[in-house]
Amino acid sequence: PFGSYVFADIGPVTGLPPADILEEYRFLTDTFLAAGARHFLFETNSSTEGLVETAAHIKQVAPDAFVLTSFSAFPGGYTRDGFFVEELVREVTESGYIDAVGFNCVSGVRPMKELVHLLGTCSLPVSLMPNAGHPIVIDGRTFYESAPDYFGTSLAALVHDGISIVGGCCGTTPEHIHALCRALAAGAGEADRENGQYVHAAMTAAQSPFFEALKAGEIPIAVELDPPDTGNADKFMVGARELMAAGVSAITIADNPIARARMDAAMLAGRVQRSLGLEPIPHMTCRDRNLNAIKSILLGLSAEGVHNMIAITGDPIPTAERDEVKSVYQFNSRKLSSFIKSLGERGDVVPFHVFGALNVNALHFPSQLGLAKKKMEAGMTGFFTQPVLSTRARENLRTARDTLPGAFILGGIMPVVSERNARFMESEIAGIHVEERIINAYHGLNRAEAEDLAVRISLEIAKDIEPYIDGYYIITPFARTALVARIVEGIKTRRGAK
């Protein structure tokens, strides 16, 4: 009776396995279809998960249905899941099942205009439903301060930029919509595309001697060195110099391992790069940072000339500390890799070489291989494995070599320094398995004898796994860089100092 369309409004379904997400969307859309709905709005999405399949189902049931998919993104063009809006819009547009695309929520009118510029040309009608400005919190309540007339006039101006559908999201009231209608009727607003579409100049991949050595089949050696747990990095830098003198190709720097705060891996990587000229490979976990913090660090690393990194989800925070220390986990390692890749493709950073972790000690290794393939699809170029300290790990490594063509694999070696150390790793460190024969070999040895044995065992493992790897990844125990330097020198001597 009002001459208006009625839309079935469906928010994002997240946090479930893919099959369950599709099932939930199917239930929601079938309920609306049974009630007679023929116009659907999928709003506030951060990814396309389940959307194309659901739209296809709607079209199969009701070919005349109209489907509008709306994404929520920050002004820089990235969603909270780390996807760039242009990629998301392209995916749903090319599916053929979506009738219109757009943006809603997160920001007000002017920041949302940036998304229109970033989007460029789109073959589908474009929708904008911004918030009524930025929120403020007073006495625990959220308010939006954008005046209706400003909202209406500003949004009406974007119609001149080719926007076909306009509306409001958080904080908008009937008066905001009335003001918008008045502005549209009066022809208010002028096209405001000052510089046309934003154009990002593509950056070429930086030269990385470590990565070039991988590609050339030179079997480079990377060594992990934990950052200090104080504000003094002198001992760390001395150890890095010692390893550099031994001939390592790169230093990897853990990011708050076992969820304990240490010196920031990215900042320390910049210092290593500037002070030593040794390639650093910082780890980046998803546990401690949101999208803004991650992007800031990536921009800084790019400026520092650090272009290799290991993306990992991160160890969980111990139960006893969770009241004081909160996890973030906005991403997992796959989403983080995809986000880093998109930053490079957009020209925001010099493209990174992103590596992931591969647990060769897993009891059900096929699931690890399946996960590794998904990581490669997300942009990872290779994997650093957990330490090989058992026959099972070596065989899994061989399987990985056969199963992951195109991936660079760096085989993990961790020197065992005592029987106590071996039993601790076997019993209390997730992802590590130490064979009993190795544990027993350390019985009764003093420190010097144990280190000599650690060198021999590590060199034996290095020789055994070399046919299946592209490089070595040696993990330094207890900051004993002199011990690791002996292993590095032993590997290089056996290989003819290649």
Residue ranges and their predicted role:
Residues 1-498:
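Domain-level signal for soluble alpha/beta catalytic cores
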